[in-house]
């Protein structure tokens, strides 16, 4: 099963992606990790990407898409894959769609997690880290994992907030890109939605990202089949 996963920062997309990975035995591939791996290994395409990054420029699609395709063709992708974090524009969606089809890896499913922008922002700003274990879930805006004051709900350890989780300008900037239905990430998602509505060659799934993690998972698994 070959899946594209869309969702704003704060939607719980990463959590659901990990669940899909385990249930369907496919890798959860994050586009940023592909860049980091190629750059750290010093691959030729990684070196080219690094030149743009070091100049503060966007890496062109002519480099990004072949890099992504290379990862999607790795041995661990025999059962499929879940790609997260790309594309981020309609133009990139068109190019990726064409490249996947040419490589014989046409998409099976596109998932869009839907969440109100303010709720997504609150979830990011509400995240708290436990001094004993960062994997202990605590969020002052999510009732199911709301801590007891400034103490971890799991172990009672002291909690703190990551500085980047409190940077409203940075959060707003990321969300501006994601929620832009004309040129941003949602525009790329809607490109695939139009294909699904036109000929059904790809399955387009929408998920309500507001309920609890188990509830969202149940909806996702039910729709994936």
Swiss-Prot record:
EC number: 2.7.4.3
Chain segments carrying region NMP: 30-59
Catalytic reaction annotation: AMP + ATP = 2 ADP
Gene Ontology molecular function: any one: ATP binding
Group of enzyme by EC: transferase
Pathway annotation: Purine metabolism; AMP biosynthesis via salvage pathway; AMP from ADP: step 1/1
Keywords in alphabetical order: ATP-binding, Cytoplasm, Kinase, Nucleotide biosynthesis, Nucleotide-binding, Transferase
GO biological process, one term: AMP salvage
Record CDD domains: ADK
Binding locations of AMP: 31, 36, 57-59, 85-88, 92, 162, 174
LID, as annotated region: 126-165
GO cellular component, as recorded: cytoplasm
Compartments in which it is found: Cytoplasm
Main location: cytoplasm
Binding annotation for ATP: 10-15, 127, 211
Subunit structure: Monomer.
PANTHER family cross-referenced by the UniProt entry: NUCLEOTIDE KINASE (PTHR23359)
Functional note: Catalyzes the reversible transfer of the terminal phosphate group between ATP and AMP. Plays an important role in cellular energy homeostasis and in adenine nucleotide metabolism.
Domain remark in the UniProt entry: Consists of three domains, a large central CORE domain and two small peripheral domains, NMPbind and LID, which undergo movements during catalysis. The LID domain closes over the site of phosphoryl transfer upon ATP binding. Assembling and dissambling the active center during each catalytic cycle provides an effective means to prevent ATP hydrolysis.
HAMAP family reported for this sequence: Adenylate_kinase_Adk (MF_00235)
Entry's family note: Belongs to the adenylate kinase family.
Protein name per the record: Adenylate kinase
Organism: Desulfatibacillum aliphaticivorans
Gene that encodes the chain: adk
